[in-house]
A protein has these predicted regions:
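Conserved C-terminal structural/oligomerization subdomain of aldehyde/semialdehyde dehydrogenase
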Residues: 1-111
Length: 111
């Protein structure tokens, strides 16, 4: 608890059972802190404000955005992937799965 945004725990992309708490003054500072990272796999907010929830979904710089939900995992039928330096390449699930798991080839045959 009471970590700062410049601490190593908050500047690296950690995959593990880790929770970090950064105190902020208001929603605007929270969004700024959330976006102040080179990574952007997943981001989330817990709020009762529909205004903040909608604004966060549109402005969080992440490939997946959750409101009042855990930030780990997605349904199998939706695209899974990040933004910025997270999750390079095409999305791994949903309609993007074909692009992720195949190589497109154009071929012609003359009869």
């Amino acid at each position: 608890t009471d970590t700062r945004n410049d601490m190593r725990i908050n500047t690296e992309e950690v995959f593990g059972p880790v929770a970090s708490v950064i105190r902020v003054r208001d929603y605007e500072e929270a969004l700024q802190v959330a976006n102040d990272t080179p990574f952007g796999l997943s981001s989330g907010i817990c709020t009762q404000s529909l205004k903040h929830a909608t604004h966060f979904k549109r402005n969080a710089q992440a490939g997946m955005v959750m409101v009042n939900l855990p930030t780990a995992g997605v349904d199998y039928h939706v695209p899974f992937g990040g933004a910025k330096s997270s999750s390079y390449g095409p999305r791994e699930q949903g309609r993007y799965a074909v692009e992720f798991h195949t190589t497109v080839k154009t071929a012609y045959t003359s009869a």
